[in-house]
Amino acid sequence: MQYNHTAMADTPLVSVIVPIYNEESTLLELLEEHGVVDNFRRLARADRQPPRRGPLYTDSDLYKWMEAAAWSLQVRPDAKLEAKLDELTDVILAAQEPSGYLNTWFVDERAALRWQQQVSGHELYCLGHLLQAGIAYYRSTGKRKLLDGGIRFVEYLLREFGPAPKRPLLTGHPELELALAELYRTTGDRRYLELAAYLFSGVERERLKLRERDVAYMFSGKPFTERRQLEGHAVRALYASTGAADYVLETGDEVFRRTVLRLWEDFALRKVYVTGGAGARAAGETFGEAYELPNRQAYSESCAAIAGMLFSQRLLHLTGEAKYADLMERALYNGICSGMSSDGTLYCYRNPLAAPANDRIRNPWYDTTCCPPNLQRTFTALGAYFFSTSREGVWVHFYENAELKWRLESGTGMELAVKTGMPWQGETEIGVSPQKQEEFTLFLRIPAWSLATRVEVNGQRVREPVRPGGYLALRRVWNKGDRVRVEFDMTPRRVFANPRVSEDHGKAALQRGPFIYCLEKHDNPDVDVFEVSLNGRAGLEPVRGSGALSGAILLRTEGLAYDGPLSERPLYEFQPAAPRRRVRLVFVPYYAFHDRGPADFTVWLPCVNCGR
């Protein structure tokens, strides 16, 4: 059953086990070590010491870390962490000017450059993350101080910028639009939503003398509703599209609605990696052409995978269609989880789908440090993605051990308790306990990869058809203590790309549940992972991981290797080289690549005997 407009409502953060999140991560210590916090402290000192350090957008890194910490407080109260956030709030706001302006780069000798570099200056980008941190802290603790500081900056913008005769304004890096929509939801002040509409209007292109290439790269500077495809900087384009989807959710604007749906189709059908990653080209961190999805050269920035998930989440709420949740899940368990090591101390800026051992992808620090705190705020906020409510009932989008205590649209309190082996095992039980007997619908997402799903309610198999890639609508009178059992199909399968993806033509990847797998040298020391093929006639055997991969499921299968190194063969021959030597192969989840140290790895392999 499809719902054209579900009017879903967010539920609060819920108790969810997120194994990849490490509360003891030292990211704040690294931000301190590299001067990010001192950049604020110095502005409250007469001598302006120490000198400012880092790129012009480092303010946002601290704001993102604060948002992550704020969301974690909602699930796990921590007095020490809350006191640290209060301290940082005071440090930040001590640097705010009486006008409301707040930025640690455009000060002193650079103050004259304010708003003169709107294409690349990141002033509004940093403000967006300040607002999101303030909103998160307010929702978690009720404290408004940081939020009010962000609002003062927005009020400054409203006074100074807008259509002529005011000064022109542009989001050179979209992000503020999302924050303004959330600020409107938090305060009810429609002026903030109208400011987002002004930014989407693109009316200032002439006054700002924008070049066509900048308009494409920024995904800003022309009317958003004229966009026909995702192009330019991947994170910018997806953040802009997410903000536009937020605008649709709050206004119902039909032209914006058609635009965001069109852009998502371009993304999902032509420009997203099998891992949920986005951004084919390192040059400019940009999208490529349709079906341009290289593997070793893939940029696939961690922030872009996060942005893609955010965009899909908004459209899930707009439409109630499971395809958006499917893409969210693909990104989360693959292209997002790969961005952080399992111990939470190493990060990926880019996430290629193949790389040699000498490609240093995971690092503790980057000069551009947008991804680490973005990953942290994503993981600490995950509980908000698992459930939604609507007039009809409750929606379950993802399955992890979680508890929801919330209320139906009627006001009746209810609890859901999910106990599951997911994402590794398919057995799932959902306890449904309304405070009083009530009729409503429980919408269960059936992932597209689960081709044969069994569902029972109180021991009786449901009669409704259970289709992959949709929501199963269980409408009934629910009573306290009702139990829903779901068995998802965890059969490992080969995945094939659209033939237009030239780099993956004749190749296959492996998937089990939500996880995409890769072949890594650590587990296949006697095989050149770049010169081996899958055997389409061989079985795919799930096996339990050990050591650093304890708790994970690996895949074992048979492959076919060449008799000798391909480097010793002629460049051109009259007969094709054929792999014939049988070898055992072990695949690990993609998110774990280089987690045990650098090693050759690849996701896509040539597939012999792989007729569909």
Each PLM stretch: what is its role?
Residues 98-101, 122-139, 146-185, 233, ...:
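Aromatic-lined, polymer-binding surfaces characteristic
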Residues 29-61, 80, 86-106:
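Low-complexity, Ser/Thr/Pro/Gly-enriched N-terminal "stalk/linker" regions
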Residues 64-79, 128-143, 176-188, 239-254, ...:
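Well-ordered alpha-helical scaffold segments within catalytic/enzyme domains
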Residues 196, 260, 326-334, 339-431, ...:
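C-terminal beta-rich recognition modules with glycine/proline-rich loops and embedded aromatic residues
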Residues 46-62, 112-126, 143, 159-173, ...:
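Solvent-exposed loop and edge beta-strand segments that line ligand/cofactor-binding
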Residues 437-458:
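Beta-strand-rich binding/interaction modules
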Residues 1-28:
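N-proximal low-complexity "stem/linker" segments adjacent to membrane-targeting elements
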Residues 66, 82-96, 128-131, 147-158, ...:
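Hydrophobic core segments within long, regular secondary-structure runs in both alpha-
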